[in-house]
Amino acid sequence: MAKVLDNVRKLYLEGIRDGNARSAVQKYTGDRYTQHSTGVADGVEGFLAFFEPFVARNPDREIEIIRFIEDGQYVFCHAYQSLNGGSAKWVTTDLFDSDTNGLIVEHWDAISPYQDVTLSGEDMVAGPNEIIDLDKTNYNKAQVHEFVKQILQEKQFHLIDQFCADTCVTHFPKAKAGKEGLVSWFQSDEFGQYDMLFKLVGEGNFVATIGKTYAQGKEHISFHIYRLEQGLIVECWDNVEAIAPRDQWNNSGKF
């Protein structure tokens, strides 16, 4: 396990799940810690000001990291949180940047309520997480980049067969099953317009993207995770969070 991935895991699990926020953020972050989770201020003290009260409010914290993607200096993780015996359940997606020592220096995220029932019948976070096909990393990243451009941004849905398998499994809570359900969701007003692809990371058969979408009068940060086989998307997950108004930010913003 690379040092940066190990540090991300430990910050998440030691710092938040186990409640050792102060020691974890001091050990696993670098000279700066730029924060894009808008409720959290920059730096060690910003992290502590948010998470020490969070730990106190939520003494029962079940946190499971479902999947990791490591791409150079970046680590992406996809996690499930159940707080206080399931009184609150969340899906979180996070991207971390690191310095040359593998210490965390920047963080982006989205959080949304975990939904027990989805339109496709698939669980929001379930599914494979094994990284394989490392030799196909660059090809798969390029394929997802074109998918975002041609399908999500340009809405050339007649090209969907070039990117998605017929049996594509969809874990989006608001998309119906299959490739047709996926297209219908991307055409909907609730999905809206995919304005900007901000980051794209990949490792083997998994690729994750962060983008800004605009739907129903609001800007959102949208994470998507794709699993590919033979160059086609065979499974996908999402996590979408509305961006709070500027006067509610404690840092420079989501991006």
What positions do the PLM features span?
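C-terminal and inter-domain tail/linker signature
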Residues: 1-255
